[in-house]
Curated annotation (Swiss-Prot):
PANTHER family: UDP-3-O-ACYLGLUCOSAMINE N-ACYLTRANSFERASE, UDP-3-O-ACYLGLUCOSAMINE N-ACYLTRANSFERASE 1, MITOCHONDRIAL-RELATED. Pathway: Bacterial outer membrane biogenesis; LPS lipid A biosynthesis. The active site is at H253. CDD domains: LbH_LpxD. GO terms for cellular component: membrane. It comes from the Bacteria. This is UDP-3-O-acylglucosamine N-acyltransferase. Catalyzes the N-acylation of UDP-3-O-acylglucosamine using 3-hydroxyacyl-ACP as the acyl donor. Is involved in the biosynthesis of lipid A, a phosphorylated glycolipid that anchors the lipopolysaccharide to the outer membrane of the cell. InterPro entries: Hexapep (IPR001451), Hexapep_transf_CS (IPR018357), LpxD (IPR007691), Trimer_LpxA-like_sf (IPR011004), UDP_GlcNAc_AcTrfase_non-rep (IPR020573). GO terms for biological process: lipid A biosynthetic process. Belongs to the transferase hexapeptide repeat family. LpxD subfamily. It comes from Rickettsia peacockii (strain Rustic). GO terms for molecular function: N-acyltransferase activity. The gene is lpxD.
Length: 346
């Protein structure tokens, strides 16, 4: 349930206005102009004043019983629905839903153009126009922060860091040795630019390697809460434009992640590995060091990758193998287990 403590409902909205806002909607030819939509709800909870959406076919059964006034469905949806629910067909129903959220809701929390008194900002730092610097933020020498950026309470921006325009840095983020592009979001507790896990061993002693690389983050990147991105030991750690990195991800020193890649929670990428463009790594994936994951490759959740992956391939399991082989192995293991259990009973 959406709480009015945190978000302002901008409704009601006319259904015709919603259709115009979403642009690519295929709607019935005649819709009553006075239909008012007050809120967005899931199918099971929607009332006659609400709009809903369907993106996962396993929830299509709820369309028969929903009370929603309207529902956004996939373009090719032909299933049954409550005759009182107006179906709005979209090329991408989940994307349409994400746009609809912006149309209906705005956060109550606002950020004035202000540097709070408790913030410590070095004289040599450059703060752009229309920025908010929150309570107890520390910004060291020679930092550059672009226009319209937000740095929330308790964050630390180390010497020489460069952050682009329209950044949103949430609470208790630590950034060192980094150059960050425009329109970047970094969620609470993330740590960027610390030493990587690099040691040379001599006569039984592990000697720390001085890391002289940095972290480079492109434009329009989102980094999740409590994620850690180490700076390179010699080569830089690089996160390209449009990447989405979930919470609790560890990215080792010198890793390169290509444009538009998605990395899900609790994944770990060891040092000097390269992830191509538009790759997808599921939850709890492990990538060994010095590997190359080709463009568009996908790794299923909990996959353990110990070898290079060709572009476009989908793998799973540990050690990771082609996804269909992994499925076959799982089926065979179940069959062997049944056979073994049958023999034991005899």
């Amino acid at each position: 349930m959406v709480s009015s403590n945190f978000y302002k409902n901008l409704g009601p909205r006319k259904l015709t206005a919603i259709i115009d806002f979403l642009h690519d909607i295929i709607a019935p030819p005649k819709i009553h102009e006075d239909i008012a939509i007050h809120d967005i709800k899931i199918l099971q909870e929607a009332s006659p004043n609400d709009i809903s959406f369907l993106s996962n076919p396993k929830y299509s059964e709820f369309l028969k019983t929903t009370k929603a006034a309207a529902c956004i469905v996939p373009k090719n949806f032909t299933g049954e629905a409550n005759p009182n629910t107006v179906l709005l067909h979209a090329q991408n129903s989940y994307f349409a839903y994400s746009k609809l959220i912006d149309f209906f809701y705005a956060p109550i929390k606002s950020y004035p153009t202000k540097i709070m008194k408790s913030a410590i900002v070095a004289d040599s730092a450059t703060i752009g126009k229309n920025c908010y610097i929150g309570h107890n933020v520390v910004i060291e020498d020679d930092v550059i922060i672009g226009d319209n950026s937000i740095i929330e309470a308790g964050s630390f921006i180390g010497r020489g860091v460069n952050i682009g325009r329209n950044a949103r840095i949430e609470q208790h983020v630590s950034i060192n040795y980094a150059i960050i592009g425009d329109d970047v979001v970094i969620l609470a507790g993330a740590k960027i630019g610390q030493d990587g896990f690099g040691f040379s061993t001599e006569k039984g002693v592990h000697h720390k390697i001085f890391h002289i690389g940095i972290v480079k983050i492109g434009n329009n990147v989102e980094i999740g809460a409590n994620t850690t991105i180490d700076r390179g030991s010699l080569q830089d750690t690089i996160i390209k434009d449009l990447c989405r990195i979930d919470n609790l991800v560890q990215i080792g020193h010198g890793v390169k992640i290509g444009k538009g890649s998605i990395i899900v929670a609790q994944t770990g990428i060891a040092g000097s590995s390269t992830i191509g463009k538009y790759c997808a790594l599921g939850g709890q994936v492990g990538i060994a060091g010095h590997l190359n994951i080709g463009d568009g490759a996908q790794v299923a959740a909990q996959g353990g990758v110990a070898q290079n992956i060709e572009a476009g391939k989908i793998v799973g399991g540990s050690p990771a193998i082609p996804i269909m082989d992994w499925h076959r192995q799982s089926i065979i293991m179940k069959q062997l287990l049944k056979t073994s259990n049958s023999k034991l009973k005899k």
